[in-house]
Amino acid sequence: FKKLGRPRLFFGISPGCMDSMVNKYTANKRLRSDDAYTPDARPDMRPDYPSIVYTQILKKLYPDVPVVLGGIEASMRRVTHYDYWQDKLMKSILVESGADLLIYGMGEKPVVELIRRFNDKRLSLNTIPQIAYLCKTTDFISEEGDIRLFSHAECLKDKKKQAANFRHIEEEI
């Protein structure tokens, strides 16, 4: 992790073009015999939930450098979600990992805008489409047309609330 040194703007993490857990385990939760995306197809090269693991390592090594998540894993886990592998509802990957920002969906345009705004430190990042970040309720200014999702705690108490959240996310994509 230290070989390339401190980045000028941020660390970007994407565990690959396929969900890491689907790539690593079968539907019966058995370890797959090979991994098409690692050298020599070795199935033991990546940890479970690599976005979380890699972010936590980078935050320990470079606590002041922003970490931006992207890819299918970040997109699908940006809000409270059901985790098949642990058979429970999990918090947003932003909470679990400690990342600063998340780009969801097709990220080519948002990442270019994110870089532009990181270069010009005066510009706000929170108005870029397809960017997710954590903030305090008191810091959030609601606008007309915003969709309010249920909190993780509310989803744990009522599975219909989690289903409603998921519906909004699916319709957004």
PLM features: residue spans?
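Glycine-rich beta-alpha loop elements in corrinoid/cobalamin-binding modules
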Residues: 1-173
